[in-house]
C-alpha cells in the first residue's frame, strides 16, 4: 500500500524548461516543486523511512501525484481546448508529437537503466519491459513480486489521458452542449465513487493474499480520474468563461485558503490510507482542494503566484527526470550508505535527496532537454503551427 508517484504528471508533470522569455507562472512552479519533494519524502519508506522528525510530511506524500494530475488536467486541457474554443482545427499530429518528445526519451532512458542494472533497483522484481513500453503496467502488475519501477503507473494514467481526452474534447465541442459536459463530469465523479466502493467491499470481503489496494484501486486509470477531471474543469473555465475566470481570480487568496482547508479534510478522510472512506469519497474532495490551489497558483496576484520562489523554477523543470529516477537512486544509495544513514532522518533525507537531484540533473541535461530541442526543430521543419499561444509555464508541460 506504499505506492505513489508523481508523475509525471508528465504534463502535470514536471516542467519542461524552455528557452522562451515569456511570462512564467511561478505559483505553478512552486506547486510542482512541492509535489516532487513531497513524493521524495513519501518514497523514503523504501529505505526504512526518515524517522519521526519527518513522519508528518512523509505520511501523505503520495498526494503529490494527485497534485500533478490536477496540474496536467489544467495545462494539457488548456492546450487542447483553446483552439477548439476559437473554432480552429485541432492538430492531433502536433499534439501527440509534442507529447512523445516530452515523455518518451527520459522514460526510455530510465527503463533501460532498470533493465540493464537490475541489482540497483529499489525492489528485486520487475514486470516485463513491454508492460512499461506500452504503458500497461498500472492495470496489470503483481506488486508483491514486481515492485521495481512501479511508480511508472502514473505515467500510464497520463498516457491514457493524452490518448482519450482530445477525442472527448472534440466530441463535446461539436455537440455544443454545456449541459452534456456537466452531466458527463458528474457521472464520472459519482461513477468513480461507486466503482471504488464496490471494488473495496469486494476485496475486503475476499481478503486475497496480495496487495489488492495498490493493484485494483490505487493504480488503475479508471479509479484515478478525479484529479485530471478537476484540472480539466479549470481549463474549461479559463478557456470558455474567461470573464468569470478573471472575476474569480480576484479572490485567488480566498481560494487558496479554502483549498488548504479542503486538504485538511482530505487528510482526515485518508487517515487510513487504504480505508473505505478515503477511497470512496476522499478522491473527489482531495482533487477539488488541489484544484483550488492550482487556481490560486495560476493567478499572478495571489500569495503564491505573485513572485518566483528561488530554486522552485529549476526544481519544477527537472521534476519529471527527478520523479523517474529517484527510486533507482534510493536503492543505489541504500546499497552503499544504508547502514550509516539508518535512523538519521534529516541527514538521510538530504543525502538521498541530493543524490537524486544530481542524477535527475544529469538525466535532464543529457536526455530530456536535448529531446525537447529536437522536438522544436522537428515541429519547425514540418511547419506545424503551435497548438495555442502559451506562457513558458504552460509549455513546460507541452
Question: Which residues does each PLM region occupy?
Answer:
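Function-critical hydrophobic alpha-helical transmembrane segments in multi-pass membrane proteins
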Residues: 145-167, 228
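Central hydrophobic cores of alpha-helical transmembrane segments in multi-pass inner-membrane proteins
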Residues: 69-79
Amino acid at each position: 500500500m506504499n505506492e505513489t508517484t508523481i508523475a509525471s504528471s508528465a504534463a502535470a508533470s514536471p516542467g519542461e524548461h524552455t528557452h522562451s522569455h515569456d511570462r512564467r507562472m511561478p505559483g505553478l512552479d512552486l506547486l510542482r516543486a512541492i509535489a516532487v519533494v513531497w513524493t521524495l519524502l513519501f518514497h523514503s519508506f523504501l529505505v526504512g523511512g526518515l524517522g519521526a522528525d519527518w513522519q508528518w510530511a512523509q505520511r501523505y506524500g503520495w498526494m503529490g501525484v494527485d497534485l500533478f494530475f490536477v496540474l496536467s488536467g489544467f495545462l494539457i486541457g488548456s492546450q487542447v481546448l483553446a483552439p477548439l474554443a476559437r473554432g480552429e482545427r485541432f492538430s492531433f499530429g502536433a499534439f501527440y508529437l509534442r507529447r512523445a518528445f516530452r515523455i518518451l526519451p527520459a522514460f526510455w532512458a530510465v527503463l533501460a537503466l532498470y533493465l540493464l542494472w537490475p541489482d540497483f533497483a529499489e525492489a528485486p522484481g520487475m514486470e516485463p519491459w513491454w508492460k512499461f513500453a506500452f504503458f500497461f503496467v498500472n492495470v496489470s502488475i503483481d506488486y508483491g513480486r514486481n515492485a521495481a519501477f512501479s511508480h511508472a503507473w502514473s505515467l500510464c494514467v497520463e498516457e491514457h489521458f493524452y490518448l482519450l481526452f482530445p477525442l472527448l474534447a472534440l466530441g463535446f465541442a461539436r455537440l455544443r452542449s454545456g449541459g452534456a459536459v456537466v452531466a458527463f463530469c458528474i457521472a464520472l465523479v459519482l461513477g468513480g465513487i461507486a466503482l471504488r466502493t464496490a471494488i473495496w467491499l469486494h476485496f475486503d470481503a475476499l481478503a486475497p493474499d496480495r496487495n489488492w489496494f495498490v493493484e485494483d484501486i490505487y493504480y488503475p486509470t479508471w479509479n484515478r480520474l478525479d484529479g485530471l477531471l478537476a484540472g480539466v474543469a479549470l481549463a474549461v473555465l479559463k478557456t470558455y468563461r474567461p470573464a468569470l475566470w478573471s472575476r474569480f481570480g480576484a479572490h485567488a487568496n480566498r481560494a487558496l485558503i479554502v483549498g488548504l482547508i479542503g486538504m485538511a479534510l482530505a487528510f482526515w478522510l485518508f487517515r487510513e490510507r487504504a480505508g473505505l472512506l478515503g477511497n470512496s469519497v476522499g478522491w473527489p474532495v482531495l482533487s477539488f482542494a488541489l484544484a483550488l490551489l492550482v487556481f490560486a497558483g495560476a493567478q499572478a496576484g495571489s500569495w503564491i503566484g505573485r513572485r518566483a520562489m528561488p530554486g522552485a523554477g529549476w526544481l519544477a523543470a527537472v521534476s519529471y527526470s527527478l520523479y523517474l529516477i529517484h527510486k533507482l537512486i534510493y536503492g543505489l544509495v541504500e546499497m552503499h550508505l544504508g547502514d550509516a544513514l539508518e535512523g538519521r532522518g534529516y541527514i538521510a533525507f538530504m543525502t538521498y535527496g541530493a543524490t537524486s537531484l544530481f542524477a535527475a540533473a544529469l538525466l535532464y541535461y543529457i536526455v530530456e532537454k536535448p529531446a525537447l530541442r529536437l522536438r522544436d526543430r522537428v515541429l519547425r521543419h514540418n511547419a506545424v503551427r503551435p497548438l495555442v499561444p502559451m506562457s513558458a509555464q504552460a509549455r513546460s508541460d507541452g
